[in-house]
């Protein structure tokens, strides 16, 4: 009986691990990549983090605190699978550098994100799915962005412009800051 109980407990624990890893459908991450996903606690501050090659799983309140500390910031909701709206990360980073805007990329997919991580100045982020354990893909992403942006803004865009922590506009295309 003890062995059976231990086996069932181990299987249940394995299921929890699988849920976290498969939340972004990345069954084929290497051990090094899995170890480079940093699951932050609710109280972890993102201010002062540098791009150290890890992806930080964060909640909307952590992102809000980070954005308030920046005069101008751009949050890029990046997904390599949404081909019609994907803007190369290096292009968005270059645009931000030219316009004195801090870029923060939030990815919903890990495998491709690790190939892009060196193209951004700041750390790359993902949603901390522990807070959104329902339907991981669509509903949880909507809930995350609704909390980050407020009820008035929708997740349908990929670029979210912030000034001193306030979302001032959302778009799917890069706009020349000097001409707007």
Regions from the language model: what does each represent?
Residues 24-44:
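Post-signal peptide N-terminal segment of mature Sec-exported envelope proteins
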Residues 37-73, 78:
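Post-signal-peptide N-terminal segment of Sec-exported extracytoplasmic proteins
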Residues 111-155:
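Thioredoxin-like thiol-disulfide oxidoreductase module
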Residues 63-92, 104-106:
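Short active-site neighborhood of thiol/selenol oxidoreductases, capturing the structured segment around
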Residues 11-14:
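C-terminal motif of bacterial Sec signal peptides marking the signal peptidase cleavage site
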Residues 16-19:
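Bacterial signal peptide processing site
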Residues 154-171:
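A short, hydrophobic beta-strand/beta-hairpin element that forms part of a small beta-sheet core
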Residues 1-5:
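Sec-dependent signal peptide recognition
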């Amino acid at each position: 009986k003890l062995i059976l109980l231990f086996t069932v407990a181990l299987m249940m624990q394995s299921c929890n691990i699988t849920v976290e890893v498969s939340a972004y459908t990345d069954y084929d991450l290497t051990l090094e990549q899995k170890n480079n996903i940093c699951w932050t606690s609710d109280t972890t501050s993102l201010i002062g983090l540098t791009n150290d090659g890890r992806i930080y799983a964060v909640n909307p309140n952590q992102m809000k605190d980070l954005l308030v500390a920046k005069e101008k910031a751009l949050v890029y909701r990046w997904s390599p699978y949404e081909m019609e709206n994907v803007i190369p990360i290096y292009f968005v980073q270059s645009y931000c550098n030219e316009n004195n805007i801090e870029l923060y990329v939030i990815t919903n997919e890990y495998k491709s994100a690790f190939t892009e991580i060196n193209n951004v100045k700041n750390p790359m982020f993902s949603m901390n799915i522990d807070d959104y354990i329902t339907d991981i893909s669509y509903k949880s992403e909507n809930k995350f962005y609704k909390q980050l942006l407020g009820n008035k803004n929708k997740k349908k865009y990929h670029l979210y412009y912030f000034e001193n922590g306030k979302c001032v506009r959302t778009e799917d295309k890069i706009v020349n800051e000097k001409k707007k």
